[in-house]
A protein has these predicted regions:
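Conserved alpha-helical scaffold flanking the Walker A/P-loop in AAA+ ATPase domains
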Residues: 41-45, 103-124
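Conserved P-loop NTPase "ATPase switch" module shared by AAA+ and STAND
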Residues: 118-134, 140
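Canonical AAA+ ATPase core
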Residues: 73, 104-109, 128-136, 146-255, ...
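Walker A/P-loop
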Residues: 43-88
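Conserved NTP-binding/hydrolysis module of P-loop NTPases
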Residues: 84-108
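Pre-Walker A (pre-P-loop) alpha-helix and adjacent loop at the N terminus of AAA/AAA+ ATPase modules
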Residues: 4-58
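Basic, amphipathic alpha-helical bundle interface domains used for macromolecular binding and assembly
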Residues: 32-37, 215-370
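C-terminal engagement/docking regions of AAA+ P-loop ATPases
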Residues: 53, 58-67, 292-447
Length: 447
């Protein structure tokens, strides 16, 4: 169903949360519209089944914003969301996160797993993930990446899920999020202070009666999740209760979330949205700067690009690691989700310019020399997001300068790849060397 039917529902969720639950200032603009980035990206995460890392100071709504989006979008009462969250702390165990043995069956000499609510429901929230010790972060790698949860000799596979994790800024109680885990997050967002005037209103209107609670449906869902039925059957029963809660939200709050079929329909609509020619070329140029190394063949975190390289003026000289293959997937999924949300016919450069800094900020490892050079600059964003925004605009400027020539070079590359005898175009950017590699032409530039 097109013509804005689902988008109207999602915009209704955004407006209700923004007006009533997560009071905020808009901090991003696209296509003449203003949005709060935390709320916008949380909704995009929910509809495209993504993974979002929300950073910020304590008490600024990192966890609550994700709870509200997950509750309304997936139509789970807030009490179930609360009861399914995982808290990050040093004593956290696999049994609390994923599942535990069924003690009754264990006494009979049988193995059976009692899965946690976190592993079962599609809305997954990890609060203060950077308080998990690095050794315990590995426990959730496969679950975070693929929705596969393993315990004893059993496996539970989620057919749909969205992950929201929060992290405070570094202090004595936090740990570094390991590289394999941080790379699995699609986007990094900051939950910002709303300003003194809005903060005063929040304090004035705080209430213990939450409109997203429903004790009866919460009890029914907890009973289903604790039951002995097969996982697929439990999810079917849970969806029935969620539909009842959805009816309640519509009747009492005028809110419409999405049932499972509708969420599937939205995903089908999003994947049909194509990138236009300019956006395709711009993303390729960005990926080239984030993975190319003239001296060593590609970026590697264990190899240092020295001064004097021919490509000193590009991002590849300022970073230590190579962009993973998850990066273009994140760009595509979130750019399509944003274009769908705005009801645009295709993904254009304006969409990806908004998306790229947030899919890049947590993945890129900058050289210390570059960090020292930039850290004193004034900014409105946390340092890592600021650097990613600056990098995106640098690439965009280079793209505008070379647009026509780059499009010609890509066209020649396509023809060569198809078997035509052509000479690849020369250019002073890593993307031209990548085109040569793709068609088997040796790079002649000096190391």
């Amino acid at each position: 169903m097109k013509n804005g039917y689902y988008q109207t529902k999602i915009r209704g969720i955004y407006k209700y949360i923004s007006d009533n639950l997560y009071l905020n200032r808009p901090d991003v603009e696209i296509k003449g519209e203003h949005f709060n980035s935390t709320l916008l990206f949380s909704l995009l995460t929910g509809i495209n089944r993504g993974k979002e890392l929300i950073i910020g100071e304590p008490g600024l709504g990192k966890t609550t914003s994700a709870e509200y989006v997950g509750s309304i979008l997936y139509r789970y009462p807030l009490g179930v969301i609360w009861g399914s969250e995982v808290s990050g702390h040093p004593e956290q165990t696999e049994e609390k996160i994923i599942g535990r043995p069924h003690l009754g069956e264990l006494n009979k000499g049988k193995e059976r797993v009692v899965w946690s609510n976190f592993a079962q429901i599609p809305v997954k929230i990890v609060d203060e993930i950077n308080r998990l010790p690095e050794t315990k972060q590995s426990m959730i790698l496969n679950g975070v990446d693929r929705g596969n949860w393993e315990y004893l000799n059993e496996i539970l596979i989620n057919d749909e899920y969205s992950l929201f994790a929060t992290a405070n800024y570094q202090d004595r109680g936090t740990n570094t999020i390991i590289a394999p885990l941080i790379d699995r997050f699609d986007v990094l967002i900051e939950s910002r202070h709303p300003g003194s005037n809005i903060a005063y209103i929040i304090g004035k209107e705080a209430s213990s009666n939450h409109p997203l609670r429903h004790p009866q449906y919460e009890k029914e869902l907890h009973q289903i999740l604790r039951g002995d039925k097969p996982y697929e059957e439990k999810m079917t029963l849970a969806e029935g209760v969620c539909n009842l809660f959805g009816d309640y939200l519509k009747e009492h709050l005028g809110l419409e979330g999405l049932n499972k079929d509708e969420r599937n329909n939205v995903n089908e609509e999003m994947v049909e949205i194509d990138f236009d020619l300019d956006t395709n070329a711009f993303v390729r140029m960005a990926l080239a700067e984030l993975s190319f190394c003239h001296k060593y063949g590609q970026k590697r975190s264990v190899e240092v690009c020295e001064e004097g390289c021919h490509y000193t003026g590009y991002l590849c000289h300022h970073i230590k690691n190579c962009a993973s293959n998850r990066l273009p997937i994140s760009i595509r999924n979130y750019a399509q989700a944003l274009a769908w949300f705005l009801e645009d016919d295709g993904v254009d450069i304006e969409h990806v310019r908004l998306i790229i800094p947030h899919v890049l900020a947590h993945r890129i490892q900058w050289k210390d020399s570059y960090l020292s050079k930039k850290e004193g600059e004034g900014r409105n964003d946390p340092f890592q997001i600021y650097l990613a925004k600056e990098a995106t605009e640098e690439i965009f400027q280079r793209y505008n300068e070379q647009r026509e020539y780059l499009l010609d070079a890509l066209s020649v590359g396509y023809r060569a790849f198809a078997g035509e005898e052509v000479t690849p175009l020369e250019g002073d950017h890593p993307i031209y060397e990548e085109i040569k590699k793709d068609i088997g032409v040796k790079d002649e530039k000096p190391l």
